[in-house]
Amino acid sequence: WIMGHMVDDIAMVDDFLDNGANGLELDISFDSNGKAEYTYHGTPCDCFRSCTRYESFDKYMEYVREISTPGNQKFRKSLIMLIMYLKLNSLYANQLYTAGSDIADQLARHYWKDDGAARAYMVLSLPSITQTEFIRGFKNRMESQGLQKYYAKIGWDFTGNEDLDDIEATYKKLNITEHIWQSDGITNCLNRGTDRLEDAIRRRDKPGNKYINKVYLWSIDKMSSIRDALDKGVDGIMVNYADRFIDVLKESKYSSKYRLATYEDNPWETFRP
């Protein structure tokens, strides 16, 4: 999975897809009432990137609905996943619950409004395990509005590099045992060790594991780092330059072992060689 990083305006959506991404990460900012407002990262952000490009959340979702709907004249079959990084750190518990409810409402209004014709999978990525009120708000609204069928398209991720045992315990409390991506990473401006990443991969591959289906690394720019991550066995990498990942996949060492995921590949299923 090639996940374009910080794809926060519509022009970048097309640029990343043109360069080979099959997944897009967008940063969702909220107002003081817990309502999703913009796709916007802000400063600081990754080195050599503009931190301030943005779009209104509703307009962004309308656009990705069009390009991920078969039969639409704008359809792009390569777009199969959206990774929604939820900028929740400034919200209190009651606002977190509202934010979860609002995301469910806005997805129903702007993305699934054609009775689910738009086909992208979505990973809801939370900064911390302390923000589970968002998940409760999201699930309660989905169920009260009869939107449970869309759970098949929803996955989960905690992206704050927290202890993996604590993350597992959180999923147990939430009764979430599937559709789990586990991230590990840091801004491309800094180096990070790989111990936690390797531990996540071991847990993913452990027989009987219920709490990690896929593992991805963020955010990587160097081709040598992409190779190293593939050698370790990640399922996806979040990148600023998707074409570099494509070039690595063309190398003989990797072309015989890896291929770009397609819509027919289940993003919630652990790959077993």
UniProtKB/Swiss-Prot annotation:
Record key words, sorted: Cytolysis, Dermonecrotic toxin, Disulfide bond, Hemolysis, Lipid degradation, Lipid metabolism, Lyase, Magnesium, Metal-binding, Secreted, Toxin
Main location: secreted
Compartments (UniProt record): Secreted
EC numbers, comma separated: 4.6.1.-
GO CC terms, sorted: extracellular region
Active site per database record: H5, H41 (nucleophile)
Cofactor binding note: Binds 1 Mg(2+) ion per subunit.
Disulphides: C45-C51, C47-C189
Cofactors that this protein relies on: Mg(2+)
UniProt key word Glycoprotein: no
Annotated InterPro entries: PLC-like_Pdiesterase_TIM-brl
Keyword Lipid metabolism listed: yes
Residues given in the record as Mg(2+) binding sites: E25, D27
Superkingdom of the organism of origin: Eukaryota
A GO BP annotation: lipid catabolic process
Top enzyme category: lyase
Catalytic activity reported: an N-(acyl)-sphingosylphosphocholine = an N-(acyl)-sphingosyl-1,3-cyclic phosphate + choline; an N-(acyl)-sphingosylphosphoethanolamine = an N-(acyl)-sphingosyl-1,3-cyclic phosphate + ethanolamine; a 1-acyl-sn-glycero-3-phosphocholine = a 1-acyl-sn-glycero-2,3-cyclic phosphate + choline; a 1-acyl-sn-glycero-3-phosphoethanolamine = a 1-acyl-sn-glycero-2,3-cyclic phosphate + ethanolamine
Tissue: Expressed by the venom gland.
Molecular function (Gene Ontology), one example: lyase activity
Family designation: Belongs to the arthropod phospholipase D family. Class II subfamily.
Function: Dermonecrotic toxins cleave the phosphodiester linkage between the phosphate and headgroup of certain phospholipids (sphingolipid and lysolipid substrates), forming an alcohol (often choline) and a cyclic phosphate. This toxin acts on sphingomyelin (SM). It may also act on ceramide phosphoethanolamine (CPE), lysophosphatidylcholine (LPC) and lysophosphatidylethanolamine (LPE), but not on lysophosphatidylserine (LPS), and lysophosphatidylglycerol (LPG). It acts by transphosphatidylation, releasing exclusively cyclic phosphate products as second products.
Official protein name in the record: Dermonecrotic toxin SdSicTox-betaIF1
Annotated source species: Sicarius cf. damarensis (strain GJB-2008) (Six-eyed sand spider)
